[in-house]
């Protein structure tokens, strides 16, 4: 039997077969038959025989795959699409004329802008997400493996107007005319998605969901920046999303290795997510009030918080001391949060301060040079500014006087001045009463003869 077929195989596989043949020479014939069979099957696939029908998602297919009322599962008109393109389009679920499989497409009239086939394999993740500060809107977010002609790769993000969607559902006869709960629309869309082969989650309908580990995960979102772009960071049971300005970021929660907090102030902090591949993504200007929720999410997902180790290293470098490695020390972020809570309890920011701030803002609006005030108002503004300058000078003098009093306790050559004065006057002092003459005259010229100098 010829051994020439071994030369056609990968070197590692050829060596393994050779080892078997040396032990069992009769096996060479079996290996050669297997090789010939594989060649025949490969040629059959190329010629189209024994080949399972599949959809070739191309523009030629789309010309024959028409959409009509008979094969439409669900249609929602005038949806505001934000990604991968920005247009008002129609969202359509329908059954393909080619093989009857479900398809999602975005239409502009009769023109297809984006089509996704094989939904059970192509849709990787889909979810409804709230729109911050706009309760009448909701996002529908979807990621996919490929689309028609591979024109796009970015996630699909569209905004649904709750009122308009409710009206469309009522006009289509999908809801009764007296229904006002938008969740009925969400439930219907989710059911259609399940029938077509994928799931759309709705994590914010109930703020608490249950993940695969049977642990309660609170879904929440917060405002932050990535570089110069402001966006929303969504923490979901299995994913973290930042959007919706390009590039949109989607993380699988299980792919996050660690989190690090930095640039911590009394009001904000930064958080950096580090993936298992070593990629780092920093999000800045996060409000301090969001820390507890992030910390709880991180702990439940068993992500590593590397902030403490970096803080201890920084302390050891600045103080020249070795790190003791105590993991129980409160982090800087926790200290800042505690300080902010203490200040609120102590009433550091009083109502008077807020009133002063409002007055200041109001005065700023009137003196911004926009030309909306009359000339008399401008003159009054100038006089007010002069009065303010005089008041500022007087306040400066008072402040300097207070500063001088405070400085009486400052150290001189490392020794407190108070101690020097005490040493200087160890002997008892004899105090002498000094008579003070009181001027009862009611002159108008009291200032000149009062004995008190005014600045």
Swiss-Prot record:
Q: What happens when the gene is disrupted?
A: Decreases nucleosomal density. Increases HTA1 RNA level; simultaneous disruption RTT109 alleviates the effect.
Modified positions (N-acetylserine) are 2
Region entry Double PH domain: which residue ranges? 68-301
Q: Where is the composition biased (Acidic residues)?
A: 350-366, 376-395, 430-455
- Quick one: where is this thing mainly located? nucleus
Phosphoserine found at: 408, 411, 450
Q: Which residues form the PH domain?
A: 68-200, 217-301
Q: Which PANTHER family does the UniProt record give?
A: FACT COMPLEX SUBUNIT SSRP1, HISTONE CHAPERONE RTT106
Other observations noted: Present with 11100 molecules/cell in log phase SD medium.
Q: Which family does it belong to?
A: Belongs to the RTT106 family.
Protein name from the UniProt record: Histone chaperone RTT106
Report the source organism. Saccharomyces cerevisiae (strain ATCC 204508 / S288c) (Baker's yeast)
């Amino acid at each position: 039997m010829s051994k020439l077929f071994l030369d056609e195989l990968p070197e590692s596989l050829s060596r393994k077969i050779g080892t078997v043949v040396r032990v069992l020479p009769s096996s060479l014939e079996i290996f050669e038959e297997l090789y010939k069979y594989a060649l025949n099957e490969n040629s059959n696939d190329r010629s189209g025989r024994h080949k399972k029908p599949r959809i070739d998602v191309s523009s030629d297919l789309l010309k024959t795959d028409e959409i009509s009322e008979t094969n439409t599962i669900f249609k929602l008109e005038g949806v505001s699409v934000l990604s991968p393109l920005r247009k008002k389009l129609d969202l359509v679920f329908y059954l393909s004329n080619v093989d009857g499989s479900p398809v999602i497409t975005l239409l502009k009239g009769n023109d297809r802008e984006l089509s996704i086939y094989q939904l059970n394999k192509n849709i990787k993740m889909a979810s409804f997400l709230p729109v911050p500060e706009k309760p009448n809107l909701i996002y529908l977010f979807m990621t996919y493996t490929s689309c028609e002609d591979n024109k796009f790769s970015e996630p699909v993000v569209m905004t649904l107007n709750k009122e308009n969607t409710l009206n469309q559902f009522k006009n289509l006869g999908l809801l009764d005319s007296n229904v006002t709960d938008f969740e009925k629309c969400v439930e219907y869309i989710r059911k259609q998605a399940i029938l077509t082969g994928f799931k759309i989650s709705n994590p914010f309908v109930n703020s608490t969901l249950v993940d695969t580990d049977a642990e309660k995960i609170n879904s929440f979102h917060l405002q932050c920046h990535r570089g110069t772009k402001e966006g929303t960071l969504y923490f979901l049971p299995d994913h973290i999303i930042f959007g919706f300005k390009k590039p949109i970021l989607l993380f699988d929660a299980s792919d996050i290795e660690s989190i690090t907090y930095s640039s911590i102030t009394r009001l904000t902090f930064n958080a950096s997510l580090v993936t298992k591949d070593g990629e780092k993504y920093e999000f800045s200007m996060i409000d301090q009030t969001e820390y507890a929720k992030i910390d709880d999410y991180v702990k439940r997902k068993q992500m590593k918080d590397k902030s403490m180790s970096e803080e201890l290293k920084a302390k050891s470098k600045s103080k020249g001391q070795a790190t003791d490695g105590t993991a129980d020390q409160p982090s800087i972020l926790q200290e800042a949060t505690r300080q902010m809570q203490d200040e609120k309890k102590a009433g550091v920011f009083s109502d008077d301060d807020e009133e002063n701030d409002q007055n200041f803002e109001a005065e700023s609006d009137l003196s911004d040079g926009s030309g909306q005030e009359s000339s008399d108002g401008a003159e009054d503004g100038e006089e007010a500014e002069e009065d303010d300058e005089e008041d500022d000078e007087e306040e400066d003098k008072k402040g300097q006087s207070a500063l001088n009093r405070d400085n009486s306790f400052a150290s001189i050559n490392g020794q407190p001045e108070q101690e020097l004065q005490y040493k200087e006057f160890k002997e008892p002092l004899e105090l002498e009463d000094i008579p003070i003459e009181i001027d009862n005259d009611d002159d108008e010229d009291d200032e000149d003869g009062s004995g008190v100098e005014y600045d």
